[in-house]
Amino acid sequence: MNPHATPVLVLSLALGTTITISSNHWVLAWTGLEINTLAIIPLISKSHHPRAVEAATKYFLTQAAASALVLFSSMTNAWATGQWDITQLNHPTSCLLLTAAIAIKLGLVPFHFWFPEVLQGSPLMTALLLSTLMKFPPLTLLLMTSKSLNPALLTTMALASAALGGWMGLNQTQTRKILAFSSISHLGWIAIILVYSPKLALLTFYLYTIMTSAVFMALNKIKALNMSMVLTSWTKTPVLNATLMLMLLSLAGLPPLTGFMPKWLIIQELTKQEMTPAAMAIAMLSLLSLFFYLRLAYHSTITLPPNSSNHMKQWYTSKPPSTPTAILASLSILLLPLSPMVHAIV
């Protein structure tokens, strides 16, 4: 790819995201989503590998279908109510269509099948964008229409996402697929609280973005695409590997790390809304995700593989430390003491 193309594509991503999150009109929001889709496709397929081209094709087809559904939903609502305002989504059919469209864009169960495959075919930093930045505009549309959405439908999709995200990640050895199923599982936590506390859903997404970005950047630095490469990278980056373990445990939601905060607040809010069974169910389902986080964390800290590995050991080289990785790693581990202040704001 031409080196001048990447900044243009990144600026287009920023433009598309800004248009969608700042618009009140459905057509403008749809335009922003389309700009985002067209800007990310060259970044997915830039390696010219057949798997990358396949991933870009799958991404384009699913996002095109979802965008068409968004447009159809808004047109149906405008036909019935005369309103193009995003917050005035009052027609029941439009609400159902929009929920399906955004679920496809986010990768919520049962529309999750494309997401792990696309992430597996993308470079690590593009996978980071797909897991974080690309989810922000559709999530913003859900937040703006949260008062019109069906709580029972979202709760069902959320519990299914938490279950399948944990269950399907159990047998994975590719780091990108593990993080894809981790993303699906976290989206379940966001979706279950979205109708009852939109601010808390947004906070959960922000913290998820910080933690996932830190993990992706750490994996990119040690060039770990699968568990075997994580297993043999301790000789090259011993400190980063130890930090990676803490970041993964934070992503799993273990106290006293940052990831515990959103889960704690969500369970508390669900209990206040008299949804104790749903809170118990999603808390139990998060144990599935905990298993594969623990397995990856164990691989990142082990200093002697239990059997001979096919990968050569990577020896230490004195490269300058990455400041963004260090900042994100610190935030993804140490934010739990701010919980009282965050709870007061939410």
Curated annotation (Swiss-Prot):
InterPro entries registered for this protein in UniProt: Complex_I_Subunit_2 (IPR050175), NADH_DH_su2_C (IPR010933), NADH_UbQ_OxRdtase_chain2 (IPR003917), ND/Mrp_TM (IPR001750)
Q: Where do the TM regions start and end?
A: 1-21, 25-45, 60-80, 95-115, 124-144, 149-169, 178-195, 200-219, 242-262, 274-294, 326-346
Membrane association type: Multi-pass membrane protein
* Similarity section: Belongs to the complex I subunit 2 family.
For this chain's UniProt record, which GO biological process terms are given? mitochondrial electron transport, NADH to ubiquinone
Entry EC no(s):
7.1.1.2
Recorded hits in Pfam families, A to Z, give: NADH_dehy_S2_C, Proton_antipo_M
The reaction(s) catalysed by this protein are: a ubiquinone + NADH + 5 H(+)(in) = a ubiquinol + NAD(+) + 4 H(+)(out)
Q: A Gene Ontology CC term for this entry?
A: mitochondrial inner membrane
What is this protein's function per UniProt? Core subunit of the mitochondrial membrane respiratory chain NADH dehydrogenase (Complex I) that is believed to belong to the minimal assembly required for catalysis. Complex I functions in the transfer of electrons from NADH to the respiratory chain. The immediate electron acceptor for the enzyme is believed to be ubiquinone.
GO molecular function (one):
NADH dehydrogenase (ubiquinone) activity
Kindly state which keywords UniProt assigns to this record, in alphabetical order: Electron transport, Membrane, Mitochondrion, Mitochondrion inner membrane, NAD, Respiratory chain, Translocase, Transmembrane, Transmembrane helix, Transport, Ubiquinone
Tell whether Transmembrane is among the UniProt keywords.
yes
Q: What is this protein called?
A: NADH-ubiquinone oxidoreductase chain 2
PANTHER family, alphabetically? NADH-UBIQUINONE OXIDOREDUCTASE CHAIN 2
Q: What class of enzyme is it?
A: translocase
